[in-house]
Swiss-Prot record:
It catalyses: RNA(n) + a ribonucleoside 5'-triphosphate = RNA(n+1) + diphosphate. It is an enzyme of class 2 (transferase). This protein is translated as a fusion protein by episodic readthrough of P29 termination codon. Readthrough of the terminator codon TAG occurs between the codons for 268-Asn and 270-Gly. Pfam families: RdRP_3. Residues 491-607 form the RdRp catalytic domain. One of its GO terms (biological process) is viral RNA genome replication. Its EC number is 2.7.7.48. This is RNA-directed RNA polymerase. Belongs to the tombusviridae RNA polymerase family. Signal peptide: none annotated.
Length: 791
């Protein structure tokens, strides 16, 4: 028996189960007959071999099925483009099937020959189109849907995430593509039903890109790079290289207290930058009423401070208060304007009797606001606080001893210290500030400061809704815009502003404006004399290296008490005359020279055709902006409405504001002062943008990096005064969750896709400000939001 087992094992004929069973047989009583023992061995061996064979067969079957599955999967992957193409082909075949119905609809639409009348003016007649010469529609060509899918994927950077905001954004983009190709509603619906699912699903390019990104060689390269960023400790180095002299020397140095080896690392020099102001390189034009007095003194360089690494690619700078800048500012912004050939010429004058056309508006306004009287100096002071009140208190005391004089209306001019967008215009004409003596402002303010509110409400009543957009929160402005939009069946918004409004305010315009004030104050002789001094302006411009004396007739002076009110009054009156004379119903949003008018889409052609010519009759150069058929694309005061999930909020254009808010015209006296300034900007910004994509994270980043700072002093400082601060004073928004509706609305407003919004927010949420000044002349730190590289 033992000999037989040895034979089976040595011969390799028995498996482990066979050996176990034969061993069990061998343990039987040896008194059994040999035939019985052999019979038992034969049975055990046969059953064991059968059992092992069945196991082998099962394993082979599993392996075979797995191999077959792999082959089928590979074949299926290779077949995926074919399936996608078949889906696209199916969609195009469906489009072709309804071709006849669509042609019939188009022919019915082309048979309309009725004249369209806007108000009292006809703007065109539909004419019949011969089907034989009708242009071939590109959407009927076979690769059209495939082209739409590729365009959309390129726009969204591949396959977008399946979020609600992305689905809406993709649908909107596909719809706009169909609209550009003049697809009819039937065709657009069919194309969207096919293209949108394809865009939201990965294709072979998406799969291949992800596979390449996670391939072994690229994964290994990334791991190698991460590993090389650090060095092993000296003990590990010695264990791995026991025969290396350098390893032993490194170990001995460490044991002796000498510095250890360190991996290469860039020096972090901080992100606070100090930029020097600049002087214009342009010198042209002269005027007989302007006399220069250069002085041999150095130019005082202004400073502009910047928080680097957080803004967009838009760059800003500041003009120095130099004689060259002052001269160009007066020549190009007071005495002359540019024509179409970029040549200087005097500002256009209004047509004779043009402002007589505004008599109806003036009388209607007077019937609403009624008559008023001047207020006392004390009541005037109650309108102000802080440093401005202190200045006016000194003027009031001065007037108690000496009444206002003609020389108090003379101008004291200087170059405005403001953030200049040098990316948009590298060397623009500097703006100048032309204030009069505060004694004169107090006397005019006693009449007009309180009256300003009544004037605005009167204009609102004439326009049948809020029109002068001053003193409102960003939510209130959004609601005003939405209410005006919803009051029309097929609304369109047309933006326009006047080129250098102050410069084009002629003497005739000032006289008409003054007549409105005099009507309200019963033609008060003292007020009439004060206002008359604004018709002929004498002034002296002061620079660090010289001065300029000049005289100009008319023009709006930036420091006058009635500058903002007068600009709004003139703009609203001229615009109202345009629509009233043409019988067109419209709503206006105005903030001085910045205007947006909302009307029916069928009226847009008349507005765009005649608006520029109408304003030219009053001596103004009107510039039309792109009309908006999507509510979120209305632009007013560099803001657009964004839906936060509950209501519309006006949001500043992040392509510019993210950079502009990182610059400071006021001085940073040290790192602690810079911290306070950054904190103040963050608090102001968050009060305007809480719950809004991207910008909420931007301002939260500023607050998070300055948590232990008290910025109340900065918020009151005169160097921090701006429209941004005044708007933020009215805001009370808080940081909160961002809804999918807000992301989609933000995409409609600014073109930033939801996925890109989340990516930028992740960058800002993880960003740490390095509090240190960068040496002057060093290149700017690369912004983390470099993707926003357009104006």
């Amino acid at each position: 028996m033992d000999t037989g087992l040895k034979f089976l094992v040595s011969g390799g004929l028995a498996t482990s189960s066979v050996i176990r069973k034969v061993s069990a047989v061998s343990s039987l009583d040896s008194s059994l007959p040999s035939s019985s023992i052999l019979s038992a061995i034969h049975g055990s061996w046969t059953s064991a071999i059968s059992h092992d064979c069945s196991k082998i067969a099962k394993v082979a079957a599993i392996v075979g099925i797995g191999y077959l599955g792999v082959r089928i999967g590979a074949a299926w992957c290779r077949r995926t483009p074919g399936i996608t193409n078949s889906i696209i082909t199916y969609g195009e075949e469906v489009v072709e099937q309804v071709k006849v119905d669509i042609d019939e609809d188009a022919e019915e639409e082309s048979d309309i020959g009725e004249e369209i009348v806007v108000g009292t003016i006809g703007i065109g007649i539909h004419t019949n189109v011969n089907p034989e010469v009708r242009a071939k529609r590109r959407h009927r060509s076979r690769p059209f849907i495939k082209k739409i899918v590729n365009l959309t994927k390129n726009h969204f950077g591949g396959c977008p995430d399946s979020s609600k905001s992305n689905v809406m954004a993709v649908s909107k983009f596909v719809y706009e593509q169909c609209k550009q190709h003049n697809c009819l509603p039937h065709q657009t619906r069919l194309i969207m039903s096919i293209a949108v699912p394809l865009v939201l699903s990965p294709d072979m390019y998406d799969i291949s890109s992800k596979a390449l990104l996670n391939s072994e060689i690229l994964t290994e390269n990334r791991a190698t790079l991460d590993r090389l960023k650090t060095l092993d400790g000296w003990l590990t180095h010695l264990v791995c290289h026991p025969l290396s002299a350098k390893a032993w020397r490194r170990a001995i140095d460490n044991l002796c207290g000498l510095p250890d080896w360190k991996a290469f690392k860039l020096v972090n020099x901080g992100c606070l930058e100090e930029l020097a102001g600049f002087c214009t390189s342009v010198r042209r034009g002269t005027h007989p009423d302007m006399t220069e007095f250069p002085q041999d003194r150095p130019i005082k360089t202004r400073k502009l401070y910047c928080l680097g690494g957080v803004g967009t690619s838009v760059k800003f700078n500041v003009h120095n208060n130099s004689l060259a800048n002052l001269r160009r500012g007066l020549v190009e912004r007071v005495f002359f304007v540019e024509n179409d050939k970029k040549e200087l010429e005097p500002a256009p004058k209004p047509l004779s009797g043009a402002f007589d056309r505004l008599t109806w508006f003036r009388r209607k306004l007077h019937s609403i606001v009624g008559t008023h009287s001047s207020i006392s100096p004390g009541q005037f002071l109650d309108f102000y606080t802080g440093r401005r009140r202190t200045i006016y208190e000194g003027a009031v005391k001065s007037l108690e001893g000496l009444s206002v004089q003609r020389r108090d209306a003379y101008l004291k001019t200087f170059v405005k210290a403001e953030k200049i967008n040098t990316t948009k215009k590298p060397d623009p004409a500097p703006r100048v500030i032309q204030p009069r003596n505060v004694r004169y402002n107090v006397e005019v303010g006693r009449y007009l400061r309180r009256f300003e509110h009544y004037l605005y409400r009167g204009i609102d009543e004439i326009w049948n809704g809020p029109t002068i957009i001053k003193g409102y929160t960003v939510e209130q402005i959004g609601k005003i815009a939405r209410d005006a939009w919803d009051s029309f069946v097929s609304p369109v918004a047309i933006g326009f502003d006047m080129k250098r409004f102050d410069q084009h305010v002629s003497s005739d315009a000032l006289k008409w404006e003054h007549s409105v004030y005099l009507d309200a104050f019963c033609h008060d002789s003292y007020l009439a004399e004060l206002l008359k001094w604004q018709l002929v302006n004498k002034g002296v411009g002061y620079a660090s290296d010289g001065m300029i004396k000049y005289k100009v007739d008319g023009c709006r002076m930036s420091g006058d008490m009635n500058t903002a009110m007068g600009n709004c009054l003139i703009a609203c009156a001229i615009t109202h005359d345009f629509f009233r004379s043409r019988g067109i119903r419209a709503r206006l949003m105005n903030n001085g020279d910045d205007c947006v008018v909302i009307c029916e889409k069928e009226c847009a052609a008349v507005v765009k055709a005649d608006m520029v010519r109408h304003w030219r009759q009053f001596g103004f150069q009107c510039e039309l902006e792109c009309d908006a058929e999507i509510f979120e694309q209305i632009e007013f005061c560099q803001m657009r409405p964004v839906y936060d999930g509950e209501k519309y909020v006006m949001v500043r254009n992040p392509l510019v504001s993210l950079s502009k808010d990182s610059y400071s015209v006021g001085p940073w006296n040290g790192i602690n002062h810079a911290r306070k300034w950054v904190n103040a900007v963050g608090l102001c910004g968050l009060s305007l943008t809480g719950g809004i994509p991207v910008v909420q994270s931007y301002y939260n980043m500023m607050i998070r990096n300055t948590q232990s700072v008290n910025s109340s002093g900065i918020l009151r400082d005169v160097s921090f005064a701006s429209g941004f601060r005044e708007l933020a004073r009215l805001g009370n928004r808080k940081s909160g969750a961002i809804s999918e509706d807000a992301r989609f609305s933000f995409y409609l407003a600014f073109g930033i896709t939801p996925d890109l919004q989340r990516a930028m927010e992740s960058d800002y949420d993880a960003h740490t400000i390095e509090w240190g000044f960068v040496p002057q002349g060093n290149p700017r730190i690369q912004p983390i939001s470099w993707t926003l590289n357009e104006l």
